């Protein structure tokens, strides 16, 4: 059976902890979409001092706040792909320590993976915490549809950049702070589990 790629990232705000998986057919498709996206935004005026940072890593917080047109261009290019964004939320009643957050992350990721009915190769945004990353690897390798799982660097993985931005859209939508209506651009491609 053929497998698909699942890029995973998380986001958090006072009300929610959200884990999102971007399910795509191949790394090549995502990399090509990212390349087209970068070419399409070359004409957008961006101050020189922010351009290097922006073009190195299209962080969602920067795009949400200052570069609506860049974010729209990114989502437009992503929408040309065959993809599905599957996410799971934890409603926070209180803030919790990192150890609890790690357990919640794994539980939400497990929920996402169990919902997907195809084999997946998972690439999750690195945490620079080898103990936590080992816990993720150990837990997820037991899922019958997980072919492989590895951490990835958001500066090197276009899929992680895309899923980072989808995470922020979902966070803004869930908290009713999506003033630019980004969610309307992806709502046909997302599923909450």
Regions found by a protein language model. Name each.
Residues 1-193:
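Phosphate-ester processing/binding pockets and catalytic centers
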